[in-house]
Amino acid sequence: DKTKQKIAFSFLIAIFLAAFEGVVVSTAAPVIVKSLHNFKMISWIFSIFLLTSAISTPIYGKLADLYGRKRIFMIGISIFLFGSLLAGLSQTMHQLIIFRGIQGIGAGAIFTIGFTMIGDIFTLEERSIIQGAISTIWGIAGLVGPLLGGFLIDYLSWQWIFFINIPFGLLSVYILAKFVHEQKPATNPKIDYLGAILLSIAIGSLLYGVMSLDEDFYLGVILLVITLISSILFYIQEARTSEPIVPLFILNKSSIIVNIITFISSFILIACSVYLPLHIQSIMGYSATIAGISLIGTSIAWFMSSISIAKLMKKYPTNIIVMFSSLILIFSSWLLTQLTIDTPLWHLSIYVFFFGFGFSGTLNTLTFIVQDSVKYNLRG
């Protein structure tokens, strides 16, 4: 119905903005460095956004279960927009890094609660269409982000890559506030503050530790040791608290397998997203526009695969769908490893089409499995 269409539209807006902010800074980086006069810290405007969003994601999931999806999702978007405003007003690189961190904190809610609310509001067939649209939005953000960023920088200023989020984000908030209705949780919420702190330390030290290994090996090792210690303490804390951030009973054999498959699939996706455009432009000698057009098949395949998943799940066991999709993903990934400077561009376009089909089939099926395997109050 029209109400669901409006709600889906608001989700797509929010997810596009968060995805857009993850990629657009790469286009603006040279101009930002020139404006704020600090080249040494340029990498932090990328990494801090990813770091804070990764830390906040599981915490938002639990808060959504305790206080309601709509409330926490709108708080997350508001934090994201506030960070966008401050980032655009930054006068120094230190300020920009801090405000990008605030953006990432808000983006964590968009990434996790958006998918949770889709599972709550829409039927299986509707979810498959929306998941396909979301996959397409991610692809569009990756392709259009640098182009739109370049346009804003050339005709306005680099600050507008942040300011542009505000009107669209407010539109998303308005639609959600008006059309999404949910019951308030029946129980009095209790927040596991210690668990949230330990989880934040574990994730933050892991990500920063891995990033530090090349430049400062000993610092990286120390941070990874901190990750191990804080993870053990987090496990102990979750085992004894009444409202754990991550209920330990969901960490069964099946969920571990799902997470491993998701991690590997996402790892491959990120690697391809980073290196394929570089290969097309730097190795094969094509323009950025041609690179974007060559990779658009990934988004098309994502959408096609997502639409077909719901129908296939009614006819075949989900493990068969995941296995078949994973085989397509593995085979297409192997094809991509065979790329050379002489590989025709249309070959690469076919490879990424199959890659997108396999990735979408794998990840979307796993998402449906996870959402349908737990109660409403644990979906976050």
Whereabouts are the PLM-identified features?
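12-transmembrane solute porter fold
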Residues: 7-13, 17-20, 25-27, 46-48, ...
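Extracellular/periplasmic helix-loop-helix junction of adjacent transmembrane segments
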Residues: 28-54, 97, 289-293
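Cytoplasmic loop-to-transmembrane helix junctions
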Residues: 6, 41, 126-133, 290, ...
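Helix-loop-helix hairpins in multi-pass membrane proteins, especially solute transporters
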Residues: 57-194, 212, 376
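Transmembrane alpha-helical cores of Major Facilitator Superfamily
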Residues: 16, 44-51, 78, 132-140, ...
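Small-residue (Gly/Pro/Ala) motifs that create kinks and tight helix-helix packing interfaces
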Residues: 29, 141-153, 206, 277, ...
